[in-house]
């Protein structure tokens, strides 16, 4: 599984003109399931995402996870947005191939599992809609962006 994460001061996602998810300071994660991914891979990616230290401590060092963005125990928001294009094969030609992405039904199942697991472990979780045409707005803080990938 793949997550492209961005530290944000705010972010939201809209589908058909309505807001489906919105957070203040926290992480926007674009999430993709690849062929062969499992719930174990989703669990591993979620653990990495929730523990990844990208927020600054009192000394200005990236040392705090999304569960403690201010060093005083305040959890940041987590906005999870499905994005199968992260698995694109761009090695040949001028058109990406999405063969490496999980089939839509499997991708939806794993994304739903990932969201449910995140909600069980983190207090502020918002989402987009799997498979929908979404408009994502964000203010990238830093900018700070990381590519996280785990194999099944």
UniProtKB/Swiss-Prot annotation:
It is an enzyme of class 3 (hydrolase). GO terms for cellular component: cytoplasm. It holds the Pfam family Tyr_Deacylase. A motif (Gly-cisPro motif, important for rejection of L-amino acids) lies at residues 142-143. It is found in: Cytoplasm. One of its GO terms (molecular function) is Gly-tRNA(Ala) deacylase activity. It comes from the Bacteria. Its EC number is 3.1.1.96. The keyword Hydrolase applies. Keywords: Cytoplasm, Hydrolase, RNA-binding, tRNA-binding. One of its GO terms (biological process) is D-amino acid catabolic process. InterPro entries: Daa-tRNA_deacyls_DTD (IPR003732), DTD-like_sf (IPR023509). Its main location: cytoplasm. It catalyses: glycyl-tRNA(Ala) + H2O = tRNA(Ala) + glycine + H(+); a D-aminoacyl-tRNA + H2O = a tRNA + a D-alpha-amino acid + H(+). A Gly-cisPro motif from one monomer fits into the active site of the other monomer to allow specific chiral rejection of L-amino acids. NCBIfam families: D-aminoacyl-tRNA deacylase (TIGR00256). Belongs to the DTD family. Homodimer. An aminoacyl-tRNA editing enzyme that deacylates mischarged D-aminoacyl-tRNAs. Also deacylates mischarged glycyl-tRNA(Ala), protecting cells against glycine mischarging by AlaRS. Acts via tRNA-based rather than protein-based catalysis; rejects L-amino acids rather than detecting D-amino acids in the active site. By recycling D-aminoacyl-tRNA to D-amino acids and free tRNA molecules, this enzyme counteracts the toxicity associated with the formation of D-aminoacyl-tRNA entities in vivo and helps enforce protein L-homochirality. This is D-aminoacyl-tRNA deacylase. The gene is dtd.
């Amino acid at each position: 599984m793949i997550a492209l994460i961005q530290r944000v001061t705010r972010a939201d996602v809209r589908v058909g003109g309505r807001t489906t998810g919105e957070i203040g300071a926290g992480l926007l994660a674009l999430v993709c399931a690849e062929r062969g991914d499992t719930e174990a891979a989703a669990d591993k990616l979620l653990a990495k995402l929730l523990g990844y230290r990208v927020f600054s401590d009192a000394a200005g060092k990236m040392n705090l996870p999304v569960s403690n963005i201010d060093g005083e125990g305040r959890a940041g928001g987590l906005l999870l947005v499905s994005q199968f294009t992260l698995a694109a094969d761009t090695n040949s030609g001028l058109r990406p191939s999405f063969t490496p992405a999980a089939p839509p039904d499997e991708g939806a199942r794993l994304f739903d599992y990932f969201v449910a697991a995140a909600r069980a472990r983190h207090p502020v979780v918002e989402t987009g809609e799997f498979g929908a045409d979404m408009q994502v707005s964000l203010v990238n803080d830093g900018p700070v962006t990381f590519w996280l990938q785990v194999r099944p």
